[in-house]
Every structure is written in C-alpha cells, then in structure tokens.
A protein has these predicted regions:
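Catalytic histidine-centered segment of alpha/beta-hydrolase-like enzymes
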Residues: 139-152
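Active-site nucleophile elbow and catalytic-triad environment of alpha/beta-hydrolase enzymes
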Residues: 9, 14-15, 78-96, 102
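Short beta-strand/loop motif that positions the catalytic acidic residue
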Residues: 100, 106-108
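C-terminal alpha-helix
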Residues: 157-168
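Catalytic histidine neighborhood in serine/cysteine hydrolases
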Residues: 126-142
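Conserved alpha/beta-hydrolase "acid-adjacent" motif
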Residues: 89, 108-119
Length: 168
C-alpha cells in the first residue's frame, strides 16, 4: 500500500518530517502565484537511467522504470500543481481504517520498502475481525503490479479470500 498523503506530508519512510512547514509555505506561495495566472507544477523526475538506478529507495528506483519507461502512458506528465500539496498532505488513508467493517485483504511484498505503510494501516483496521495481511515473498512494491509470478499469486489469493467472504 502507498499512503500518498503520508508520503507527501512526512516524506518517504517519514524522512522529511523537519521540512513539513517549509513545504506548506511553498504550497501557499504557489497559491498566491496562481492567483496571478502563474501555475507552478512539481513532481516529474528528470533523471537518466543511471541516476535512477542510484536512487536510495527501491520504490523510487523500480517506480522510475515502471512509470517513466516500461508502462508510461503517452499522455501522462506525472505533474501536479504545487499548491495542491496542501490538500495532498492533509489526506491520509490511515485516518478511517477503523471504520472498515467488511472483510479486508491487504497485500504487500514482504521485502517492500513501502510495507511500513501497509502494516500501520492494517493495525488500524480494528472494525473487522475478518482481515488478513498477505505477504508476497520476495516482492517489492512495484513488482506486485506486473511481475507475472507475483500477479498470479495475488490473483489466486484474491479469489480464495473473496470466495470465502462474498456471498454468491
């Protein structure tokens, strides 16, 4: 799972906690510029393949090649307005996990550097007793999207889980 609000707010693996106020100030400033017609866009990774291979987190290394090279949509820019960071930082997938009262299956790669977000959300899903965290052995986050052996394993798990809990 990828909690985009948490990452926009705290940085990946909570690595930018000390710059939250600075980034909010930049978003507020961007909103002022938008009033004058100057929209500031952020988000694209202008990297060479060699630079991408050196990124510190597997999510970003794998994500660069998946989203920018092998599976990129021709119309995607990967950009968003800097002012929207205020809203993006405010949203958090974990906030209402306790309200889930239906069967819940969460799937994550067991070696994924995003797993901390899945683990945190799963712990907060206290509204259902029918829940399971399924770990895909050897998988990183992005690999769970497209690597056939992982996708097939996930599809089988989805069939098993929802076959058990969904009424026919």
């Amino acid at each position: 799972m990828f909690n985009s609000g948490r990452v926009r707010r705290n940085g990946f693996q909570d690595s930018q906690m000390d710059t939250i106020q600075q980034r909010l100030a930049q978003a507020a400033e961007a909103r002022t510029f938008e009033k004058e017609g100057d929209v500031r866009l952020v988000g694209a990774m202008n990297l060479t393949d060699e630079q991408a291979k050196k990124l510190p987190f597997a999510l970003y290394r794998n994500g660069f090649f998946y989203y920018f090279r092998t599976h990129a949509h021709p119309n995607s820019t990967f950009l968003y307005t800097q002012s929207s960071l205020m809203d993006l930082m405010n949203w958090d997938v974990d906030d209402r996990m306790a309200m889930i009262h239906q069967p819940l299956l969460m799937i994550a790669g067991d070696v994924s550097d995003t797993r901390y977000m899945t683990d945190d959300a799963f712990k907060k899903a206290t509204g259902t007793k029918d829940k399971e965290l399924y770990l895909v052995k050897g998988a990183q986050h992005i690999e769970t999207y497209w690597v056939p052996k992982y996708v097939n394993e996930e599809a089988a798990k989805l069939q098993e889980f929802f076959g058990k809990y969904l009424k026919k």
